[in-house]
């Protein structure tokens, strides 16, 4: 057992660098600053600020310059970090068991045998407008709810945090999940180039950089067939898990390699031909797809060889009237509407959400003594929530690959670790590999990227065996990157 101190609190950040520089660590304008002198009478007319909530865990009696610190955040966009905090590498862990829906409360919170505190201090940060954090002032939502605005807020938060706790000279890591990986690509670049904070390692979990690879809505973008090719190995893993294949291979990983080769070869070729594909080739590819993902040949031909995530989730276990999960395809639940073409809800989200939110609310008040009389928002209030996907002034589909590439070029020692689940259809693992292997960097720099896959879903840590692997592999990554930087 590792002795640690837990601190829950908030730090206030500004919505521009100029304004942020004039805010003290208490979040108030520094006396005599331009900001203090021009303070409006009404708080709603003041420049926007975000009070960001965090929980930090520090190992007792550790030397700051020798002790790594890792900043964690979930995605959404619009999500608090309750999921990573209560499920992954923090000192406490929500017991969720297997791939089944949990019964209602009481739920069980236990000490986490796989906490990362053995190698790093941990900071779990809630994005602006979630958790116990609040955004306020003029145009507050526009000032924080967007790709660039959000990354800037996190960079300002981290700069303030390492000032408050004297951690400028500690090895630093950022750990984002899902949209949090999108944030990390932008954030690593902003920290390095705007705040002079070099990061030792970027740890990505369930990555999405390029939003045109999304398998949820590929039909909106005809002619872009990449999403189908990158999701195919996840379809195959899912069919394998649910034993829906005509011939069931014994081992998963060699089977997935075979599917990847097919996906980038004969499958990609047939899709690229569009309406020029011959009947013979189409029939052959449909037959092979049937062998790999278990859906009927006639269904695959009707779908023109292109099956969206929602269609796959609805169709794979249709004979049992079950809908397959999206975030974790090992989960299944009763279909809401048997005649629906696509899945109408996600069995995994509905299976575990209540346990996480209930236990966090209990833990933060009883153990951390924080939040009395306040409401904890697991997500931004979605009635008013709108996210601005414009990045660097570019309104077309979001792709943050250039940001990470730039961070790696300007800090060639930066190491990147990509983690993902074979059973994740929200951000398929093969898409993450494809994105990383297409970063505009040299082959030498690409050696700084490593991949780690797990027999789990989007939140790989809900499966105990995967959580243990995640801990061991992330711990090894932190050790190795420190050895490299000495």
Language-model segments: residues:
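Catalytic histidine-centered segment of alpha/beta-hydrolase-like enzymes
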Residues: 455-466
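Alpha/beta-hydrolase fold catalytic core
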Residues: 270-426
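A catalytic-pocket lid/entrance helix-loop region that shapes and gates access to the active site
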Residues: 90-97, 188-293
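N-terminal cap/lid subdomain of alpha/beta-hydrolase-fold enzymes
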Residues: 19-145, 437
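Active-site-adjacent alpha-helix of alpha/beta-hydrolase-fold enzymes
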Residues: 425-448
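Alpha/beta-hydrolase fold nucleophile elbow
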Residues: 167-179
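Conserved acidic catalytic loop of the alpha/beta-hydrolase fold
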Residues: 152-170
């Amino acid at each position: 057992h590792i002795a640690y101190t837990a601190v829950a609190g908030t730090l206030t950040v500004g919505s521009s660098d100029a304004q942020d520089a004039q805010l003290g660590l208490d979040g108030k304008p520094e006396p005599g600053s331009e900001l203090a002198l021009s303070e409006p009478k009404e708080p709603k007319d003041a420049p926007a600020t975000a009070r960001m909530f965090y929980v930090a865990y520090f190992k007792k009696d550790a030397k700051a310059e020798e002790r790594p610190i890792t900043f964690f955040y979930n995605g959404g966009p619009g999500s608090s970090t309750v999921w990573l905090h209560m499920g992954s590498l923090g000192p406490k862990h929500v017991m969720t068991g297997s791939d089944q829906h949990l019964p209602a409360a009481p739920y069980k919170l236990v000490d986490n045998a796989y906490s990362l505190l053995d190698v790093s201090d941990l900071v779990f940060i809630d994005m602006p407008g979630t958790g116990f954090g609040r955004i306020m002032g003029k145009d507050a939502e526009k000032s924080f709810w967007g790709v660039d605005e959000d990354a800037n807020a996190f960079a300002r938060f981290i700069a303030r945090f390492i000032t408050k706790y004297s951690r400028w000279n500690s090895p630093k890591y950022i750990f984002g999940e899902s949209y949090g990986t999108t944030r990390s690509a932008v954030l690593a670049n902003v920290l390095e180039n705007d705040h002079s904070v070099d990061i030792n390692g970027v740890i990505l979990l369930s990555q999405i950089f390029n939003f045109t690879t999304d398998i949820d809505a590929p039909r909106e973008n005809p002619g872009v067939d990449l999403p189908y090719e990158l999701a195919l190995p996840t379809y195959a893993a899912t069919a394998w898990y649910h034993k829906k294949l005509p011939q069931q291979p014994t081992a998963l990983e060699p089977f997935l390699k075979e599917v990847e080769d097919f996906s980038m070869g004969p499958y990609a070729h047939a899709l690229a031909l569009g309406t020029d594909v011959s009947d013979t080739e189409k029939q052959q590819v449909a037959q092979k797809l049937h062998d790999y993902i278990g859906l009927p040949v006639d269904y695959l031909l009707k779908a023109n060889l292109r099956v969206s995530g929602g269609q796959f989730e609805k169709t794979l276990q249709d004979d049992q009237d079950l809908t397959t999960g999206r975030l974790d395809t090992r989960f299944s639940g009763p279909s809401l509407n048997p005649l629906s073409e696509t899945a109408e809800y996600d069995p995994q989200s509905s299976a575990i959400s209540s346990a996480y939110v209930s236990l966090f609310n209990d833990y933060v008040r009883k153990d951390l003594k924080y939040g009395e009389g306040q409401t904890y928002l697991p997500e931004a209030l979605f009635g008013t929530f709108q996210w601005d996907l414009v990045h660097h002034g570019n309104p077309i589909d979001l792709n943050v690959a250039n940001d990470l590439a730039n961070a790696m070029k300007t800090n060639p020692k930066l190491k990147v670790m990509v983690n993902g689940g074979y059973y994740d259809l929200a951000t398929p693992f093969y898409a993450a590999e494809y994105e990383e292997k297409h970063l505009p960097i040299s082959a030498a720099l690409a050696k700084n990227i490593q991949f780690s896959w797990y027999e789990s879903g989007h939140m790989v840590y809900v499966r105990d065996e995967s959580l243990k692997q995640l801990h061991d592999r992330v711990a090894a990554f932190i050790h190795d990157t420190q050895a490299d930087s000495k």
